[in-house]
């Protein structure tokens, strides 16, 4: 009775009804295969042998090519005996990034396509910095490596108010991994506890250097980026707010637009602020001025940060990486 009462207190009526539908679902698998090509690809792939020379890299559900996995892909580009695929939602944008950085040996596969499902089922090596969606299940003979993308300064998993039991897919992904990589002990402890995996996870957990941080110290790239964008005589800042953990909050875009509009009006002429919003809120968001501009799609964010003079953020763990450069950090915590 206590468990039932706790469940009703923590889980809204709407979510309980949704859970009932899922538990009693008797859908036609043929329908699923026809409507969702990635499901068909994944199921077809179960009948095929695992390809030992194939590597799949997915960052933030295909929304970006950046950070740890961009740095890793740059190194894997030199391995001619592997077929390396990066998952991308926007193939044209992703191809532009590969072209800029001359990553000729890296191929692309469109997120949620038939080929995507097929490759997830047949690639021997799977690398992610977030999670694969719930339809994915690792086969025997596959190796799954997760390089978690951030340091959890805020709450995650069961610690997020109103998100009871919604961390299940993340926990499930972690349980399937062969190895988990974190840049510090704090991240490892915080994540595993918030996902209820502390003491039960069988994966190898490593505390290791951040591959993406090496990009911050490339002084040649710093000069080249400033020259390419004609900003050599400007003070450059990058604004990167974090995700606030609520997909239903429709005011987020409005808030960010107000912030950027205010900056555009008040910044002096010798200062430019480039912004990169969290991948969870960038859909349909557009703002561009003279002094406030979106981060160009053709640059990896860590590569670009080698050329900036300071970072503006709120709770984003990117501040920890940026601090290694000994540059200015402005914490703009307007909702603290």
Named regions from a protein language model:
Residues 1-53:
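Membrane-proximal basic amphipathic "stem/tether" segments
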Residues 41-51, 136, 171, 226-230, ...:
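Short boundary motifs at domain starts and secondary-structure transition points
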Residues 53-217:
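Active-site and donor-binding regions of nucleotide-sugar-utilizing enzymes
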Residues 65-74, 78, 210-286:
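Conserved catalytic-core segment of nucleotide-activated headgroup transferases in glycan assembly
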Residues 88-92, 279, 335:
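Residues in the short beta-alpha loop(s) of Rossmann-like NAD(P)-binding domains
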Residues 109-124, 279-320, 325:
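Donor nucleotide-activated moiety binding/catalytic core segment of transferases
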Residues 118-119, 137, 173, 230, ...:
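Structural alpha-helical scaffold elements that stabilize or flank donor/cofactor-binding regions
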Residues 125-155, 299-336:
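A donor-sugar binding/catalytic signature common to diverse glycosyltransferases
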